[in-house]
């Protein structure tokens, strides 16, 4: 496995192991009603939480939460820590990379340009909501500027910009 992917897509492998462990714990527990919602990204987790309705049964919530996470596409904008190749593209240390659910979506030198290209690769005709969670290394001004550009490019989508405060990732993007 490419060490570069240990940040980003490589995290999905770790989360799959966590899901397996959670399901195993559920199988071993007889006196509690445990439901595992198999989220693999932070945006999926947020969508699952928003889908939860306290008045509904556990089974209804499980169905709604699981359906909700199926609609989420996740993107992450970060930087390369070393020279490498990802998806047949040459990456140099310090390059800005846009990673999606299934691989590299964009690479370049400018954070906002790579973020825009990443989002463009994620949005389709069914997209309704674009959420941008900017990290500790992206200014509020840059995040708001990105949000405005995305609103102009996709007027039929709702665009939200929120401070996520995450390290390493300039922004994490959710498209639903």
Q: Model-predicted segments: where are they?
A:
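Glycine-rich phosphate/diphosphate-binding loops and the adjacent beta-loop-alpha structural elements
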Residues: 91-112, 120, 124-147, 172-176
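Short, ordered loop/turn segments at secondary-structure junctions
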Residues: 14-18, 32-44, 51-55, 134-139, ...
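Polyanionic, low-complexity intrinsically disordered segments
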Residues: 1, 34-36, 148-151, 157-161
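Short coil/turn connectors at secondary-structure junctions
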Residues: 7, 30-33, 92-94, 100-101, ...
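Short Gly/Thr/Asp-enriched flexible loops that form oxyanion-binding sites at enzyme active sites
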Residues: 17-31, 142-147
């Amino acid at each position: 496995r490419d060490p570069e992917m240990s940040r980003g897509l490589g995290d999905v492998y770790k989360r799959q192991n966590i899901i397996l462990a959670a399901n195993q714990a559920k199988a071993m527990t007889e006196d509690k009603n445990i439901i595992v919602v198999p989220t693999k990204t932070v945006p999926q987790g947020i969508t699952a939480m928003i889908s939860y309705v306290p008045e509904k049964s556990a089974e209804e919530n499980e169905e709604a939460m699981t359906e909700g996470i199926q609609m989420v596409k996740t993107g992450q904008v970060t930087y390369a820590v070393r020279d490498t190749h990802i998806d047949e593209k040459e990456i140099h240390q310090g390059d800005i990379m846009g990673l999606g659910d299934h691989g590299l979506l964009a690479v370049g030198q400018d954070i906002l340009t790579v973020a825009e290209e990443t989002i463009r690769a994620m949005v389709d005709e069914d997209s309704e909501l674009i959420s941008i969670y900017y990290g500790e290394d992206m200014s509020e001004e840059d995040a708001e500027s990105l949000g405005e550009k995305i609103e102009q490019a996709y007027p039929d989508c709702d665009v939200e910009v929120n401070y996520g405060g995450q390290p390493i990732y300039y922004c994490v993007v959710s498209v639903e």
